Amino acid sequence: MSDKTVKSTNLMAFVATKMLERQEDLDTCTEMQVEKMKTSTKARLRTESSFAPRTWEDAIKDGELLFNGTILQTESPTMTPASVEMKGKKFPIDFAPSNIAPIGQNPIYLSPCIPNFDGNVWEATMYHHRGATLTKTMNCNCFQRTIWCHPNPSRMRLSYAFVLYCRNTKKICGYLIAKQVAGIETGIRKCFRCIKSGFVMATDEISLTILQSIKSGAQLDPYWGNEKPDIDKTEAYMLSLREAGP
């Protein structure tokens, strides 16, 4: 087995443990799913003991380190001040540090920047790759990604969102409306794959409409030039975009 298998096991050990720490927020079905994920992860850990011996606690610690660049939240969405409204529902956004570097050789990630006639607004271009529909507004290989994950106890779903920006032009370059995927373990793995593959955006028509509204109103903001995220400024900025509307 590869080192990737070990890392995946460590990640799932960390995620399962963190989710069960907020057991009171999970309904019975969701709790059973997470417990099943924990059991299967422990079984994988025993299988890997012949070539990568480690304790459950060690796996959790390493999984937490591997999780650097993303953030898993099991708090109530109402605790997050910034949100985007879609079909009358508000989807919260949270911000986390992430790496600033191209990822892999994803053809969509490596596609060129596409400015419109006046060079100020970046045209959204639809791509279809491996069954996913993605929207690319621009690409300078300098993306900063952030992800928000929230297990929804009532629907047994995992929602996630990406906010992307370009440090070269100091503009927002992409935005992914929170999307729900079925199954806790499947959803978490899908989030990991999105990050590792460098996919910029997976969207539907509603998401694209909101994206176009946000990018057309993109403006210079001190946050985008910062070396590290300024959480308060960013949340206030995204909140102002939502309140301004299309």
Curated annotation (Swiss-Prot):
Further comment: The strain C/Ann Arbor/1/50-pi causes persistent infection.
Alphabetized UniProt keyword annotations: Host cytoplasm, Host nucleus, Host-virus interaction, Inhibition of host innate immune response by virus, Inhibition of host interferon signaling pathway by virus, Inhibition of host RIG-I by virus, Inhibition of host RLR pathway by virus, Interferon antiviral system evasion, RNA-binding, Viral immunoevasion
Phenotype when changing A96T: In strain: C/Ann Arbor/1/50-pi
Principal subcellular localization: host cell
Pfam families found in the cross-reference section: Flu_C_NS1 (PF03506), Flu_C_NS2 (PF03555)
Mutagenesis / variant outcome for changing V84I: In strain: C/Ann Arbor/1/50-pi
Species the sequence originates in: Influenza C virus (strain C/Ann Arbor/1/1950)
One MF term in the entry's GO annotations: RNA binding
Name listed for the protein in its UniProt record: Non-structural protein 1
Any Gene Ontology CC annotation: host cell nucleus
Job description of the protein: Prevents the establishment of the cellular antiviral state initiated by host RIGI, which normally triggers the antiviral transduction signal that leads to the activation of type I IFN genes by transcription factors IRF3 and IRF7. Also participates in the up-regulation of the splicing of viral mRNAs.
Mod. after translation: The NS1 protein of strain C/Ann Arbor/1/50-pi is phosphorylated.
Keyword RNA-binding: yes
Localization, UniProt: Host cytoplasm; Host nucleus
Record-linked HAMAP family: INFV_NS1
GO process annotations (BP): symbiont-mediated suppression of host cytoplasmic pattern recognition receptor signaling pathway via inhibition of RIG-I activity; symbiont-mediated suppression of host type I interferon-mediated signaling pathway
Family label: Belongs to the influenza C viruses NS1 family.
Outcome after substituting T39K: In strain: C/Ann Arbor/1/50-pi
